[in-house]
């Protein structure tokens, strides 16, 4: 059965057709609308989906935010241009005329990456470092979503009680410091206004402030991973997202993690499916692969 998979992120929307063998075809992307209105997101999704829907039999959505009974609830509204509530499943069913499933994007990506691991791995955590910071937890071969859909939102754990206010309302969240948006917000002087991609470029050129911002992000993520190891005793952690997959970033995270006491060390690897992990995980779940 062909699935029309959609990934809704803070900076881009992606869609593709995925068959039962996880082959991807006709991948398309659009920028996530900056408008705070539901109509803007609805129209962007319609433009993304219309060319693909005739060949699909179902829709699977991986979206940033919390998914509750088909509704998209933004824990950090800044990641979706201020959007707080959006009837995601209802909207896509109306656009595509197909049965629709929705799941958090990091949870979906965790499920895809779990399937790429050796069979003896039953406990893993996926962490995405991108516009925001998210995660997905697989425990004893089962994806944890939680009754309220909050499971795996690791970016909203505490990094610094004196840190910046996060869009979720807490102070000093991992996401507020380590995410691409958090790094950009902390940039000063000649880096003010630069996005995360530019900060990585400048860091590669030796710019001291840019190098500090990248290093600080990696250290915060490493400390969070130590907390995750203590909480879940996972066998491995997989890192994805535009920041997480940036050149040299994983190596910095690994170096900082090795500075933690040995019980908190855990194997780290880059996401095998890279930026397609959310699409593939959502398709797997829609196809009934829930173990």
Swiss-Prot record:
GO biological process: N-acetylneuraminate catabolic process
Pfam families recorded: ROK
EC number: 2.7.1.60
Binding locations of ATP: 5-12, 132-139
Cross-referenced Gene3D superfamilies: 3.30.420.40
Single GO term (MF): zinc ion binding
Keywords: ATP-binding, Carbohydrate metabolism, Kinase, Metal-binding, Nucleotide-binding, Transferase, Zinc
InterPro entries referenced in this protein's UniProt entry, alphabetically: ATPase_NBD (IPR043129), ManNAc_kinase_bac (IPR023945), ROK (IPR000600), ROK_cs (IPR049874)
Catalysed reactions, as listed in the record: an N-acyl-D-mannosamine + ATP = an N-acyl-D-mannosamine 6-phosphate + ADP + H(+)
Annotated metabolic or biological route of this protein: Amino-sugar metabolism; N-acetylneuraminate degradation; D-fructose 6-phosphate from N-acetylneuraminate: step 2/5
S-S bridge residues: none
UniProt binding sites for Zn(2+): 156, 166, 168, 173
Domain of life: Bacteria
Assembly: Homodimer.
PANTHER family named among the record's database cross-references: N-ACETYLMANNOSAMINE KINASE, ROK (REPRESSOR, ORF, KINASE) FAMILY
HAMAP family: ManNAc_kinase
Protein purpose: Catalyzes the phosphorylation of N-acetylmannosamine (ManNAc) to ManNAc-6-P.
Similarity-based family: Belongs to the ROK (NagC/XylR) family. NanK subfamily.
Name of the protein: N-acetylmannosamine kinase
Organism listed in the record: Salmonella typhimurium (strain LT2 / SGSC1412 / ATCC 700720)
Lineage: Bacteria, Pseudomonadati, Pseudomonadota, Gammaproteobacteria, Enterobacterales
Gene name as annotated: nanK
């Amino acid at each position: 059965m062909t699935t029309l998979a959609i990934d809704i992120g803070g900076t881009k929307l992606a869609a593709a057709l995925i068959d039962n063998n996880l082959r991807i075809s006709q991948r398309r992307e659009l920028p996530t609308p900056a408008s705070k209105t539901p109509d803007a997101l609805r129209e962007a999704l319609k433009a993304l989906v219309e060319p693909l829907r005739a060949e699909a039999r179902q829709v699977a959505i991986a979206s940033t935010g919390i998914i509750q009974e088909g509704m998209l609830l933004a824990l950090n509204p800044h990641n979706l241009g201020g959007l707080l509530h959006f009837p995601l499943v209802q909207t896509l069913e109306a656009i595509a005329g197909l049965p629709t499933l929705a799941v958090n994007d990091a949870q979906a990506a965790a499920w895809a990456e779990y399937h790429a691991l050796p069979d003896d791995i039953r406990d893993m955590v996926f962490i995405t470092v991108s516009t925001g910071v998210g995660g997905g937890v697989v425990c004893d071969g089962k994806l944890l979503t939680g009754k309220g859909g909050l499971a795996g939102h690791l970016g909203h754990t505490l990094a610094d009680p004196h840190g910046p206010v996060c869009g979720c309302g807490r102070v000093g969240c991992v996401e507020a410091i380590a995410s691409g948006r958090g790094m950009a917000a902390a940039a000063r002087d000649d880096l003010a206004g630069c996005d995360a991609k530019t900060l990585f470029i400048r860091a590669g050129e030796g710019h001291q402030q840019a190098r500090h911002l990248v290093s600080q992000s990696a250290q915060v993520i490493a400390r969070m991973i130590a907390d995750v190891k203590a909480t879940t005793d996972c066998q491995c952690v997989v890192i994805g997202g535009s920041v997480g997959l940036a050149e040299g970033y994983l190596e910095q995270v690994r170096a900082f993690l090795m500075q933690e006491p040995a019980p908190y060390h855990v194997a780290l690897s880059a996401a095998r499916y890279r930026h397609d992990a959310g699409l593939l995980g959502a398709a797997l779940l829609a196809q009934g692969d829930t173990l």
